[in-house]
Curated annotation (Swiss-Prot):
UniProt family annotation: Belongs to the phosphatidylserine decarboxylase family. PSD-B subfamily. Prokaryotic type I sub-subfamily.
Name assigned to this protein: Phosphatidylserine decarboxylase proenzyme
GO cellular component terms listed in the entry, alphabetical order: plasma membrane
Organism: Pseudomonas paraeruginosa (strain DSM 24068 / PA7) (Pseudomonas aeruginosa (strain PA7))
Catalytic reactions on record: a 1,2-diacyl-sn-glycero-3-phospho-L-serine + H(+) = a 1,2-diacyl-sn-glycero-3-phosphoethanolamine + CO2
Length: 289
């Protein structure tokens, strides 16, 4: 590891993650025209954001930076995969890792893995249906579309807010911060689908101001304690989301992890670490019995 990388990792442990993220969140919600217009223009130029696919192409039309960052796309910008039974990629970005969940652990990077149960808030009962299953980790870069969508149609069963650190999420931290995704703040969403239980985990990162879901709105930051929300079939209005429907969004960041049970899916050919992906593309197909 280079000296620059060592210094970066050292700073990750020393920086006040949540304070820094709150300050960035305050700036991202600032509506002062002179400030937000300059910030949005700089960001779009710095990260070469393609505004031609956005519903609102005019950078100055956004009321604040967060509105720009979580911008909606034009209808048809992400057509869903047409393969029968296709499991859709939940977000734009790149595959960080994907593969089998082995011995209750998920591969993070060479020499590193993390606990499935810890990812889900330390609940062995929640983890049980995914033991021996499969996972896919999608990293969203700053230039990407930052809404997360349903890989399959599903009915929400449970949501868990898991407090944690806010390490940056990138290749350097994945290779050098043990249990990275099981240490960062995250929101776990569990669904019942035609392929059995499915979990979509929204993982926060440094300067990620908040995570939202379409049914609960702002989920982070509440009090920094683990909190579980249960949604059962006896509820007056069960929460059901169709395949491809928006699930949630990040305000600055970061990573979405999708979990499936054993023998349910086979990942699409050609997918591997660092493969660029777009929301709606074929992530996996049903595994044949």
């Amino acid at each position: 590891m280079s000296f620059k990388d060592r210094l970066f990792i050292c700073c990750q442990y020393l920086l006040p993650h949540h304070l820094l993220s709150r300050l960035v969140g305050f700036a991202a919600d600032c509506r002062a025209t002179w400030f937000k217009d300059r910030l949005i223009a700089w960001f779009a130029r710095r990260y070469q954001v393609d505004m031609r696919e956005a519903q609102v192409e005019d950078l100055q039309a956004y009321e604040h930076f967060n509105a720009f960052f979580t911008r909606a796309l034009k209808d048809g910008a992400r057509p869903p995969a047409q393969e029968p039974g296709a499991v859709l990629c939940p977000a734009d970005g790149a595959i960080s890792q994907l593969g089998p969940i082995e011995h209750g652990r998920i591969f993070q990077a060479k020499g590193h893995s993390y606990s499935l149960a810890e990812l889900l808030g330390g609940d062995a009962e929640l983890a049980a249906p995914f033991m021996g299953g499969d996972f896919a980790t999608v990293y969203l870069s700053p230039r990407d579309y930052h809404r997360v969508h349903m890989p399959l149609a599903g009915t929400l069963r449970e949501m868990v807010y898991v407090p944690g650190r806010l390490f940056s999420v990138n290749r350097t931290t994945a290779e050098n911060v043990p249990e990275l995704f099981a240490r960062n703040e995250r929101v776990v969403c569990l669904f019942d689908t035609e392929r059995g239980p499915m979990a979509v985990v929204l993982v926060g990162a440094m300067i990620v101001a908040s995570i939202e879901t379409v049914w609960a709105g702002l989920v982070t930051p509440p009090k920094r304690e683990l909190k579980t929300f249960r949604y059962d079939e006896a509820a007056r209005a069960p929460i059901h989301l169709e395949k491809g429907a928006e699930l949630g969004r990040f305000k600055l960041g970061s990573t979405a992890i999708v979990l499936f049970g054993p023998q349910q899916v086979a990942f699409a050919q050609g997918l591997g670490a660092a493969t660029p992906v777009r929301m709606g593309e074929c992530l996996a197909l049903p595994k044949q019995a």
